[in-house]
Amino acid sequence: MRESLHIQGGQCGNQIGAKFWEVVCAEHGIDPTGRYGGDSELQLERINVYYNEASCGRFVRRAVLMDLEPGTMDSVRSGPYGQIFRPDNFVFGQSGAGNNWAKGHYTEGAELIDSVLDVVRKEAENCDCLQGFQVCHSLGGGTGSGMGTLLISKIREEYPDRMMLTFSVFPSPKVSDTVVEPYNATLSVHQLVENADESMVLDNEALYDICFRTLKLTTPSFGDLNHLISATMSGVTCCLRFPGQLNSDLRKLAVNLIPFPRLHFFMVGFAPLASRGSQQYRALSVPELTQQMWDSKNMMCAADPRHGRYLTASAMFRGKMSTKEVDEQMINVQNKNSSYFVEWIPHNVKSTVCDIPPTGLRMASTFIGNSTSIQEMFRRVSEQFTAMFRRKAFLHWYTGEGMDEMEFTEAESNMNDLVSEYQQYQDATADEDEYEEEEEEEEFAQHDM
């Protein structure tokens, strides 16, 4: 079995994670006590991807929960599905990281990290063939960003050949929870560029917009936002868990989506968008799904794909549908919007079809795109970072935990390099002369010296 080990860190990560597990439990017919009450053999066929079967016939999740304060975990534990986590897999401190990346990465988090790694090791040893790790965290706070990236780099050392997928919630453009978000996010991206294989970029503001505009919710709660995220998360892994006509896994996804190793930050979308209470009453068709899925208003991060070009994209359909129709729709999208795809990667949209739809829907689709427009997001965070860093504002909180200013400078330049790499490939064309390329190579050689 190709198991996937789920790790959630910090308040945001734990809340998203809890929602995600509700969705997965519903899909596999697992009730809040961990017993199977479903109606289809297929639900049990590959249940091992996310669950361990305990001796008494109960299913226990392959999940590790960590935080530097007990609050969020207590609410997860007392939540509707809190009973199916292994009690030993809750690892928490008492002091909190206080939105300080350095506390999460160097001081408080570093003290707790070994206990987290012990749990991760124990879970990994329980797997027949571990495919990889998925980490939920936010980049604006202290624990999810600081300790989350610390854990990712430690896991990277210990399991270098396993896939590392992150669901990372970026700071929003207009809505800010904490002043030091730009610092925390930039320091985290600096780590993610090096240590993650695939990062799904999420953003509260874009999720709010979807709730207002598409779902017509007047006062969306974090619960509604997390519901959207969990639908996408479940879509990304559905091929591991259910049989399909065209399968994919985390590794195939990476091979098809990442043309250059540093450019592994993806935009995600989901269709059909329905609010939590209302199941949609109209039957959906593949063309409708495709249209909604590629719609820029559907993207869960605050970047507009129309401002850049897609390097690659992947569409994951779920439900009973004809693969021929899926292929036709995909070709159709690429032909109609050819200017939004780079022409130097032919056939750059991968599609997968999984037979089992999500609970309560006849068909659904998840979209993952590697678009150069995501640089808007990095650029925005980078500008805010520079504005504060020039004045050395709030820096004493970080240096007081033993950080060096040099690390900030490195993180800043790494983020700026990332932005310019995206820009470079956005502007690249297929028929540039080899002569130009040689010139560029020479420039790079001089640059590196």
Curated annotation (Swiss-Prot):
User: Can the keyword Magnesium be found in this entry's annotation?
Assistant: yes
Asked if the Swiss-Prot or TrEMBL record annotates the protein with the keyword Metal-binding, the reply is yes
Q: Mind telling me which GO cellular component terms the entry cites?
A: cytoplasm; microtubule
InterPro entries, from UniProt?
Beta_tubulin, Tub_FtsZ_C, Tubulin, Tubulin/FtsZ-like_C, Tubulin/FtsZ_2-layer-sand-dom, Tubulin/FtsZ_GTPase_sf, Tubulin_C, Tubulin_CS
Q: Which UniProt keywords are given for this protein, alphabetically ordered?
A: Cytoplasm, Cytoskeleton, GTP-binding, Magnesium, Metal-binding, Microtubule, Nucleotide-binding
Query: Which region ranges are annotated with the description Disordered?
Result: 426-449
Acidic residues bias (residue ranges): 429-443
- Positions contributing to GTP binding: Q11, E69, S138, G142, T143, G144, N204, N226
* Localization annotation: Cytoplasm, Cytoskeleton
Q: Which GO terms describe its biological process?
A: microtubule cytoskeleton organization; mitotic cell cycle
Task: List residues binding Mg(2+).
Answer: E69
Q: How does it assemble?
A: Dimer of alpha and beta chains. A typical microtubule is a hollow water-filled tube with an outer diameter of 25 nm and an inner diameter of 15 nM. Alpha-beta heterodimers associate head-to-tail to form protofilaments running lengthwise along the microtubule wall with the beta-tubulin subunit facing the microtubule plus end conferring a structural polarity. Microtubules usually have 13 protofilaments but different protofilament numbers can be found in some organisms and specialized cells.
Which family does the record claim for this protein? Belongs to the tubulin family.
Q: What is this protein called?
A: Tubulin beta-2 chain
